[in-house]
């Protein structure tokens, strides 16, 4: 491949990069080179295409960068997983397919930061709608003709879903019929990025499928970006590794970095943009001393609160190899059955204290007892809640360890570094126990398997969190948007102090959102795509949305009080 020129070069064909590639090439006179370090999203590989197989990609390295943190000092010095997607679709190719946009107040809070006034919820909502096709049709909150297929939960799938939602309501928390609609707060059905044919709705399927045949888009897989090239303070191209060759491509307009919250700061640092002292440690020529690159790293940490199930209604039999051929065949031929769901079909968001302005705890309900990555399956019928805090004050960093593009960076999330983290996790465990002991779950609830009913004191609960809490795989905020001294990009994703260079992915979030990150990342890319194309922003929404405004976290008394559990 000889040196060539394109208008735009996109590094990373993930949740954001595929959106940009598709939208920019809608203009036939614009040429785009899309680089992806992984391979194609093979449509016959059940590991990425079958929703129920979501744990499989995390167990290997074909589709997973399989990063690992440095020893986390507040987590028994454990080196913890940090899985990131590798292949067309990026992390949308291996994620849990939960379609959660975040709380309206996440975006309203962003907009209070200097220069981010056009990132309110009502400014963002039109872009969420633009990206989405929801199976039950559009309304003020949801789209009907976007690239991403969103499937709603249907009643009667598993009695544990309805029982867990009802238990949350019986504990005094709100019920909501749409976690992405008027009111996120409460318990209810969970939307999923799954097609009507029961396939994963990655951005490769939703976006690239409509763009890959365009003559003005070139997609190169197995292309690992090495460095961004500069002329003075202007980005001019990218050098990447493709097989045994080192290839250079030039960008007439811009280089767009969409490599995610780990690899985007890594690429910037390797290219000479980042904290000067870090770059000098590796003898990297400093193009721009930008101290925020790799700082402000955030994630969601979660626990699995697990119970034995007294009735044989869980997914436990589906884990047995002798039942899996039938499940796979039903999915492959009909796009239905257990294989067609990620089985996160209910969940919720609550405030654990009345003075929380919006939900600080998320629930994913699952009708089986197993770790997210498929490990530690409990050998019995069981169910669980994935529970974690949403906006930890702890901050970490991504730091380059080597100039070798194949070397992983040093990653430290610094989980549980603040007193608020510990308070929220203790509150979450106690609130979950109270929910699980409500009458709606009486017929199903057996023994508490994890943490175990005998663990009650603060010290005992803290020890459980240190030993057993895991990542929810939501790294973000490491190239934050804003205008303070630690901001990396402006409100349009443009890197401060550099021309022709943007970062567009979850790394530019100033503060992590309340929930899963795939939907917000797609929205961010849709919004910035209009900025790049110099198009008028979509008209601001006037939809109503819920604000607690001092209302108690629980609107009613629990059906069964804590003293009785």
From Swiss-Prot:
SUPFAM superfamilies, per the entry: FAD-linked reductases, C-terminal domain, FAD/NAD(P)-binding domain
Alphabetic keyword roster: FAD, Flavoprotein, NAD, Oxidoreductase
InterPro entries, per the entry: BetA (IPR011533), FAD/NAD-bd_sf (IPR036188), GMC_OxRdtase (IPR012132), GMC_OxRdtase_N (IPR000172), GMC_OxRtase_C (IPR007867)
Coiled coil region boundaries: none
Catalytically driven reaction(s): choline + A = betaine aldehyde + AH2; betaine aldehyde + NAD(+) + H2O = glycine betaine + NADH + 2 H(+)
One matching Pfam family: GMC_oxred_N
Positions with a binding annotation for FAD: 7-36
Pathway connected to this protein: Amine and polyamine biosynthesis; betaine biosynthesis via choline pathway; betaine aldehyde from choline (cytochrome c reductase route): step 1/1
Function: Involved in the biosynthesis of the osmoprotectant glycine betaine. Catalyzes the oxidation of choline to betaine aldehyde and betaine aldehyde to glycine betaine at the same rate.
The protein, known as: Oxygen-dependent choline dehydrogenase
Origin species: Burkholderia thailandensis (strain ATCC 700388 / DSM 13276 / CCUG 48851 / CIP 106301 / E264)
Lineage, top ranks: Bacteria, Pseudomonadati, Pseudomonadota, Betaproteobacteria, Burkholderiales
